[in-house]
Amino acid sequence: TLTRGVAMVTMHPIVTGGNVSEWGISPSPLSGLTFIDGVLYGTPLVNQTTPITYTIYANTSGGTTSHTLNITVNEPMFMFSYVPENQTLTRGEELYSWSPTWFNSGYPQSWSIEPALPNGLVFDNGTISGMPTVNSTRFEYIVWANNSGGSSSASINITINEPAPEMDYSPDDLILTRNTTMSVLQPTVTGGIIDTWEIEPSIPNGLSFIEGIISGTPLSIQNRSQYTIWANNSGGSMVAYINITVLDIIPEISYTPVNMTLTNDTMMSDWLPV
């Protein structure tokens, strides 16, 4: 069994008995092989995956003898790799072409990959392309290239992240009143699905921050303060800034009685607000 493009080990006949005056071979050797005086050598240039039976004849003045041998020529094993071997993709974004690089003259007859690629990605003759539709943590895949010379493999790793989130708060400058329930403040969210939310520093007493939503009734006054809000997912983080001011309650006053009649040069009683 030989390999295309690889020099074979020279085959010499073992001759006993009389001197051979003439040699013959049938059928003719494959392209790249030479048969001279019973010696077979060379570098096969074509594949022959089905064995061919050759008959070699040795002729002497006393007669002819023959010997048969079978020759198979396989394709060189295909050696390849992927550069890069690690890909970090984003759900919903196109991967145009991720193809192998090979290092020898072998040519693959078939390809396979294990396990199956995530939804949206396509594996075609060793090339990976498409638009992933699901998220995936880092996962290893084995790619196989097969031909008559055997199989070779390469490992690759694929991570698929959620698209980075985008968000906005409107209004972003809140003026609240102590002991007065605020209007719920919800962010406008686009991009990927948000996994976690954060806010710094802690919001004023009486307010709550849940899944990006600020609500509640502030219990104490405070000067204008800036807060940083993060929206996070596997694709990254988005930052927004808001300001919160908490004012004191507007006082309410009244006088009883509403009307007072005074006398000139006469001391009045204190008239105090209620």
PLM segments and residue spans:
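Proline-enriched interdomain boundary motifs that mark the N-terminal boundary
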Residues: 1, 76-84, 163-171, 249-257
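A short beta-strand segment in extracellular, disulfide-stabilized domains
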Residues: 7-15, 94-102, 181-189, 267-274
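Low-complexity "stalk/linker" and mucin-like segments enriched in Ser/Thr/Pro/Ala/Gly
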Residues: 24-39, 113-126, 198-213
